[in-house]
């Protein structure tokens, strides 16, 4: 059985080596699942004999004031990836535009729906930043445009004025702009960076997830925001009716109360990202100045395997269009974990 290569394949590592690794390949909160969320999941177990609410009514009602968006403009799914595939199957775009490098599931979902995928290649000379040059790639033949904010794996943020120019270009060409903000909430200034103020346009859909910020990748819970309720209804109908389990819904409801936890995660990332960046550069590695809870850096192509044999796992970016085997993505984790990564890197590079 084959599938797209992603980070966080702890099961594959354990099967190969017989033990767990220090995993920097998955971009989830280094603080783990909040205790309040774990308690909510446990409390929901006695009701697991019931079907979950297919419309996630309670969760959407609580998300509405949290996001400042009407509940009818919110759709929940089995992680953001589920919603990406539902969107492709519901909208059935003929041609779509993605940046390169970026998250692989955009193209995978689009191609599964028979869509032709065009790539706007970002340039290493400007640290793979999205610039105004993307506007000329949005033509009347393009039905959908994906923009990851901050981009995965580069960690680069597209300035909000440029996001708005991209949206206006999409509107002029009849395309839907999909802005993936799944990692944006790791930033303390996320409220000033989100595209939510542009949601009066029915040509904008924003993707969000509980997975990363709340350390609940195994629970699978994401949602999207869009003023085009007809599109959301089509997405709801494009997959199975009970995509979000009752345990995941309980987890989401509890997670929205974890304000102290979120503040702690944001403070940790803000402290550790520049520290890890400096440590990597001190080893002679090229590191991009990203804003996310992960970093993209360049090193020897043998680096990933050498670390893996020592029990440390990075995300090789060799399968990202626009990158090669010399690029790696590392999560920003706790101070002791980051120190262990730097120590092991120093041994390998010596």
Task: Describe every region a protein language model picked out.
Residues 89-147:
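PLP-dependent aminotransferase-like
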Residues 111, 129-141, 153-177, 181-213:
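Active-site pre-lysine segment of PLP-dependent enzymes
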Residues 32-34, 55, 203-287:
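PLP-dependent aminotransferase class I/II
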Residues 119-121, 144-151, 177-181, 288-289:
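Short beta-strands and strand-loop turn motifs
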Residues 52, 64-86:
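Short loop-beta-helix segment that forms the pyridoxal 5′-phosphate
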Residues 161, 309-310, 319-350:
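PLP-dependent enzyme catalytic core of the Aspartate aminotransferase-like
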Residues 1-50:
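N-terminal "arm"/small-domain region of PLP-dependent enzymes with the aminotransferase-like
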Residues 269-270, 280-311:
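Conserved PLP-binding catalytic core of the aspartate aminotransferase-like
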């Amino acid at each position: 059985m084959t599938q797209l290569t992603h980070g966080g394949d702890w099961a594959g590592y354990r099967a190969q080596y017989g033990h767990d690794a220090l995993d920097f390949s998955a971009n989830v909160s280094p603080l783990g699942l909040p205790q309040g969320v774990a308690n909510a999941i446990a409390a929901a177990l006695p009701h697991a004999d019931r079907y979950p609410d297919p419309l996630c009514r309670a969760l959407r009602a609580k998300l509405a004031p949290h996001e400042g968006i009407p509940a009818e403009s919110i759709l929940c799914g089995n992680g953001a990836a589920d919603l990406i595939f539902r969107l492709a199957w519901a909208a059935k775009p003929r041609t779509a535009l993605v940046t390169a490098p970026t998250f692989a599931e955009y193209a995978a979902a689009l191609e599964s729906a028979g869509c032709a995928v065009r790539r706007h290649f970002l340039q290493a000379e400007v640290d793979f930043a999205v610039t105004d040059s993307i506007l000329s790639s949005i033509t009347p033949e393009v039905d959908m445009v994906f923009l990851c904010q901050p981009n995965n794996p580069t960690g680069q943020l597209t300035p909000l004025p440029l996001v708005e120019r991209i949206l206006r270009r999409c509107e002029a060409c009849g395309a839907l702009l999909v802005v993936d903000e799944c990692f944006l909430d790791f930033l303390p200034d996320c409220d000033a960076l989100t595209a939510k103020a542009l949601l009066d346009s029915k040509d904008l859909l924003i993707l969000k997830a509980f997975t990363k910020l709340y350390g609940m990748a195994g629970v699978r819970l994401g949602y999207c925001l869009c003023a085009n309720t007809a599109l959301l209804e089509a997405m709801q109908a494009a997959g199975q009716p009970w995509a979000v389990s009752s345990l995941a819904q309980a987890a989401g409801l509890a997670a929205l109360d974890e304000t102290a936890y979120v503040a702690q995660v944001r403070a940790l990332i803000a402290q550790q990202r520049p520290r890890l960046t400096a440590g990597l550069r001190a080893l002679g590695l090229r590191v991009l100045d990203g804003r996310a809870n992960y970093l993209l850096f360049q090193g020897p192509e043998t680096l990933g395997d050498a670390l893996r044999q020592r029990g440390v796992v990075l995300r090789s970016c060799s399968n990202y269009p626009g990158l090669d085997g010399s690029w790696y993505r590392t999560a920003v984790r706790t101070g002791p974990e980051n120190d262990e990564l730097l120590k092991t890197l120093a041994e390998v590079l010596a």
